[in-house]
């Protein structure tokens, strides 16, 4: 084998030498290179050795600046968007043509560029475009894109117009002891039709000091004044006001400072932008992923920050609740006296990448008080049973998770409530509180469709007379769950004998007079909910949200004693809803929401709201909401 290899190598060498000899031209035609240059001369540089960094412009094109003359002025291009006046003071002037001082590095100009040669049509995407103060889509000093003072102080001005038209049908009692809206009304429950118009105007001024996007801000001052105008039209008396002479229409307006706070970073906890900050004033806060327990904007002192390269987040907050306006649900300047303490801790990538766990502790102290709302209805204490002012002291222990495990999305929440109620109006005695709540949602994304299923349970009270309140209730919830604002059961406040069977934007049938002004009630029937639904991104601009909820009371013993009806069943009914979100500009600057829903009554709902002929028409509701943001 080794001998054959040597023979082959020798053959290849012979062939290569012969070929080279045939390809070599005669000696007379070969150039003879000069190995050494003549004496006193440099060796010539071949062209292929030239490098771009060593190129020199022709001497004829170079015109030196005269010494002592004015420095060379370079052309100035305007910066992009709307920059406003610079807040950086110049520290020097240009002294020569080689150095041009640029103090405000944020407002560097760029030349105009018509990328496609079309003359910049309105709907085409062009780089290096100039803007105006009223254009939030381009760089704008009013949107925090350029500093207004120095290099690090920015102002973000945000305007929001929220318009809501809500047409709904809810069981509505008549006024059997006073005049009715129409003659010869015999039914206890009259016309269910109601029409609501709500208009909000928000203006947020956010002044903050900071650097880049990933670094937490050093300090912030924020103020949000709000104007609200609302109108309610109903078909029955004593809905807008207990005084039937006030009619069936109510017009209200309200102005307030909804948000106002100052924020300061107290310390950096690591080189990886971990920090701890303090925020004092009226501010938004949501206690968990979906808003099951507490979701509000109110007066607070909040300590918050991150740890372990932003993998962990924490909050410590104390809320001193301000009284709410009845019709706009905005904060008033009146103190309510309710104290809420919250602490939670988040851990990202817990066991599974993309899955976040949360543990929380909450304490609610709601002292005894006596309160009529702006429409002259009694809201504290609840106007049922022996309505005596009472004090609530309740603690909540929570454990939650949100994220995805592989291709499956999961959200879950558990709360255990414990504490004491000095005198529950329904039970007519003091109560020791021990109640639970659990929720879970599973979903799977398939192309442009998300398929969902979820379950919700809040425990009910099985014995109203035993002194132990086991019906779970929240503090001020606003759950984004099982359809959320598109669901009939969550969106509508269904009243029942002076209180609400379920409050607006809540899941729990807690028999409270008002979610925003009443007190938590742990003597309630509780809820079992099973949901199936799907969300579909029909186009990049249009999204559809569909849900079907099956509803049961967890326990009907409280309702049986409250209504003096032993025949109440646990089946509430089936809630069917469909919602649409339309974004005409593919952004959240303009969003139109539309929703329609209906509740197909079950035997339990029928026994509470049936008519003389033992029938209940399925209530239907629809709404249109338009959000325009600058």
Predicted regions and their residues:
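Signature for the C-terminal beta-barrel architecture of outer-membrane proteins
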Residues: 272-274, 283-469, 528-530, 537-540, ...
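Outer membrane beta-barrel
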Residues: 200, 204-324, 409, 442-491, ...
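C-terminal structural cap/anchor segments
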Residues: 455-458, 462-571
């Amino acid at each position: 084998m080794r001998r054959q290899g040597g023979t082959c190598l020798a053959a290849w060498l012979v062939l290569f030498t012969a070929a080279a000899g045939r390809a070599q031209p005669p000696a007379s035609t070969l150039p003879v290179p000069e190995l050494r240059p003549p004496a006193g001369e440099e060796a010539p540089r071949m062209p292929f050795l030239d490098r771009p960094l060593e190129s020199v412009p022709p001497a004829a094109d170079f015109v030196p600046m005269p010494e002592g003359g004015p420095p060379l002025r370079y052309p100035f291009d305007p910066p992009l968007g709307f920059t406003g006046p610079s807040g950086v003071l110049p520290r020097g002037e240009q002294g020569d043509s080689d150095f041009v001082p640029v103090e405000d590095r944020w407002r560097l100009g760029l030349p105009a560029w018509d990328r496609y040669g079309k003359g910049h049509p309105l709907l085409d995407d062009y780089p290096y475009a100039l803007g105006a103060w009223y254009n939030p889509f381009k760089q704008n000093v009013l949107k925090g894109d350029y500093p207004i003072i120095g290099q690090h102080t920015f102002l973000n001005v945000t305007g929001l117009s929220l318009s809501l038209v809500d047409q709904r049908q809810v069981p509505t009692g008549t006024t059997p002891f006073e005049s009715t809206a129409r003659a010869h009304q015999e039914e206890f429950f009259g016309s269910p039709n109601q029409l609501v118009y709500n208009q909000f105007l928000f203006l947020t001024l956010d002044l903050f000091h900071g650097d880049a996007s990933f670094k937490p801000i050093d300090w912030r001052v924020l103020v949000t004044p709000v104007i609200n105008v609302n109108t309610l039209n109903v078909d029955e008396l004593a809905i807008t006001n207990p005084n039937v002479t006030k009619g069936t229409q109510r017009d209200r307006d309200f102005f307030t400072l909804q948000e106002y706070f100052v924020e300061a970073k107290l310390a950096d906890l690591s080189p990886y932008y971990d920090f701890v900050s303090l925020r004092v004033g009226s501010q938004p806060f949501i206690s968990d992923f979906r808003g099951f327990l507490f979701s509000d904007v109110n007066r607070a002192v909040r300590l918050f920050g991150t740890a372990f390269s932003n993998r962990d987040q924490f909050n410590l907050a104390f809320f001193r609740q301000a009284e709410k306006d009845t019709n706009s649900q905005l904060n008033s300047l009146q103190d309510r006296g309710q104290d809420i303490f919250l602490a939670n801790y988040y851990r990202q990538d817990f066991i599974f990448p993309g899955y976040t766990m949360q543990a929380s502790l909450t304490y609610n102290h709601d002292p005894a008080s006596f309160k009529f709302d702006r429409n002259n209805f009694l809201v504290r204490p609840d106007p049922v049973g022996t309505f005596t002012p009472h004090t609530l002291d309740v603690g909540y222990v929570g454990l939650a998770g949100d994220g995805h495990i592989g291709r499956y999305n999961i959200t879950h929440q558990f709360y255990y409530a414990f504490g004491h109620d000095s005198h529950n109006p329904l039970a007519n005695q003091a109560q020791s509180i021990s109640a639970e709540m659990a929720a879970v949602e599973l979903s799977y994304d398939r192309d442009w469709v998300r398929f969902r299923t979820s379950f919700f349970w809040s425990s009910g009270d099985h014995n109203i007379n035993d002194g132990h309140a086991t019906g779970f209730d929240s503090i001020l919830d606003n759950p984004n769950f099982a359809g959320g604002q598109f669901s009939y059961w969550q969106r509508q406040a269904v009243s029942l004998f002076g209180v609400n069977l379920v409050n607006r934007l809540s899941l729990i049938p807690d028999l409270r007079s008002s979610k925003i002004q009443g007190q938590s009630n742990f003597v309630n029937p509780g809820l079992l909910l099973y949901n199936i639904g799907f969300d579909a991104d029909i186009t990049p601009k249009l999204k559809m949200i569909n849900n079907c909820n099956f509803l049961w009371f967890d326990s009907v013993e409280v309702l049986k004693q409250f209504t003096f009806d032993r025949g109440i069943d646990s089946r509430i009914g089936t809630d069917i809803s469909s919602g649409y979100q339309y974004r005409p500009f593919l952004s959240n600057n303009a969003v139109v929401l539309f929703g329609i829903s209906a509740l197909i009554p079950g035997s339990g709902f029928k026994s509470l709201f049936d008519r003389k002929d033992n029938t209940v028409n399925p209530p239907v509701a629809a709404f249109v909401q338009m959000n325009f943001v600058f």
